[in-house]
Structure formats: structure tokens, C-alpha cells
Regions:
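A short, surface-exposed alpha-helical micro-motif characterized by mixed small hydrophobic
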Residues: 193-195
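Catalytic Walker B motif of ABC-type/P-loop ATPase nucleotide-binding domains
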Residues: 152-156
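Conserved ABC ATPase "signature" region
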Residues: 99, 103, 108-123
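Conserved ABC transporter NBD signature motif
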Residues: 59-70, 74-75
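ABC ATPase "signature
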Residues: 211-212
Length: 240
């Protein structure tokens, strides 16, 4: 199985504060990988450095075998990124935003079908600003998938969704994974991580304190429940 993401020695500092500390990651194609950690652990900066939208101080990154800083245009056609919010015209409708997004790609998925899969098929004529928080979140996932990416980054993918909607998203993502999609996600929902992730990495103050599977994390910590293992490894309770 080939690598979709390869990261070696990734480091990023702001002044004297190191926010990503010599991070090493490897994500196999066709798998779901979870990057976990408390708020401020370095997850967002890590993703920005991996994507090349933020300049790392040092380290090597390969996405689908290519350097994201040198092959941005080509990788744009192969990688989807879920944005939490966007600077859209206040009156733009869901259908208009989807069509505009589809026009950016050489090949695009049927956005109507994607909207249906994510439970917003009846919102095509609705203004984006009128959607609920959960509906907007699902729309942003759809937008990340319109370009038929080989690899997609999903940041806090089901924040704002109720339990039924969350499980619907999980089911759709599992189906896309079976079709070969590689998914890199962040989440604060440990049941979501258990349901979706083949492998995880837990960050604590920019340093990877665990890499492996959910079962390995539980075994390492002697915990029956993954949430307990996560809290122990991340020290999130202590940080709070």
C-alpha cells in the first residue's frame, strides 16, 4: 500500500515557542488517519504546514508522492480541504457555491448526489447564510469532495451535528474510503475516532506522544475505553 502522506522532522516555531516539534507521520493510501490533541496542541499548524499554506522551519513533506510547495497546482486537483467558514457572498445559494467550486476542477463529482449523501439534498436553493450550523458543516465537507480528491483533510468534521447526522457522515465517509479515498481528520469526539480511524497520532504541545491504533493506545495505557487513554496520553484533563 502506497503512502498518501509522508512527513519527516516537521518543525514550526513562533519566536521561542515551538508549536510543531520534529513531527514524523506516514499515512497509507485508502485509510483514515486521525490527528488528535487538546486545543493549542498544534493540530491546525501541522495541517497548514503539511498543505504548504504555512512555511515550516524544517522538515520534509510529501503528499501523494509530491512536494506540496512545488506542485501546488497539480495537487490542488487531487486534494480536498474542508474549511470551517468561507468568505462567501452573503446571498449565495448552495447550488451556486457548489457549481462555482466544481468549475475549479478538471473533473468534478455530482454535487447534487453528494449533497443528498450528506443529508442536505433539499437545500440546493437555500442561501448558505440561512443554513443551520450543522448543515453548513456538511456543506463544507461536500465542497471538499466535489473535486473527486484522492486525499481529503477534514478539520473537526462533525462539530455542530446531532448524533444521527454524525453517524450519517461516518457512513458516507466509510463508503468513500472503500472506494480508495484517503482521509486525514481532526476530531474531539472519541467515538468518532474509534468508528473511523485506522491509525491516530496524539499531539501534546506540538510533540507526538502516541502513534498507532486505537486498540494500541488503550493497551499502552491499560484503559478499557479509548477516551480514558486519550485523556491520559494528551494530559487534556490536566491542561484544563
Amino acid at each position: 500500500m502506497s503512502e498518501a502522506i509522508f512527513v519527516e522532522g516537521l518543525t514550526k516555531s513562533y519566536g521561542e515557542k515551538t508549536v510543531v516539534n520534529h513531527l514524523n507521520l506516514s499515512v497509507k493510501s485508502g485509510t483514515v488517519f486521525g490527528l488528535l490533541g487538546a486545543n493549542g496542541a498544534g493540530k491546525s499548524t501541522t495541517i497548514e504546514c503539511i498543505l504548504g499554506t504555512k512555511q515550516a522551519d524544517s522538515g520534509t513533506v510529501r503528499l501523494l508522492g509530491q512536494d506540496p510547495k512545488k506542485c501546488r497546482r497539480e495537487l490542488f486537483q487531487k486534494i480536498g480541504v474542508q474549511f470551517q467558514e468561507g468568505d462567501y457572498h452573503k446571498e449565495i445559494k448552495v447550488c451556486e457555491l457548489c457549481e462555482e467550486t466544481a468549475s475549479l476542477y478538471r473533473k468534478s463529482a455530482d454535487w447534487r448526489k453528494l449533497c443528498g449523501q450528506f443529508g442536505i439534498g433539499d437545500k440546493a436553493k437555500t442561501a448558505v447564510k440561512s443554513l443551520s450550523g450543522g448543515e453548513r458543516q456538511r456543506l463544507f465537507i461536500v465542497l471538499a469532495l466535489i473535486g473527486q480528491p484522492h486525499l481529503v483533510f477534514l478539520d473537526e468534521l462533525t462539530t455542530g451535528l446531532d448524533a444521527k447526522a454524525r453517524r450519517g457522515v461516518w457512513k458516507t465517509l466509510e463508503s468513500l474510503k472503500e472506494q480508495g479515498l484517503t482521509i486525514f481528520l481532526t476530531s474531539h469526539f472519541m467515538d468518532e475516532v474509534e468508528a473511523l480511524c485506522d491509525e491516530i497520532c496524539i499531539l501534546k504541545k506540538g510533540t507526538a506522544v502516541f502513534r498507532g491504533t486505537v486498540e494500541q493506545a488503550k493497551a499502552q495505557c491499560g484503559c478499557e475505553h479509548f477516551e480514558d487513554a486519550y485523556l491520559k496520553l494528551s494530559d487534556e484533563e490536566a491542561d484544563e
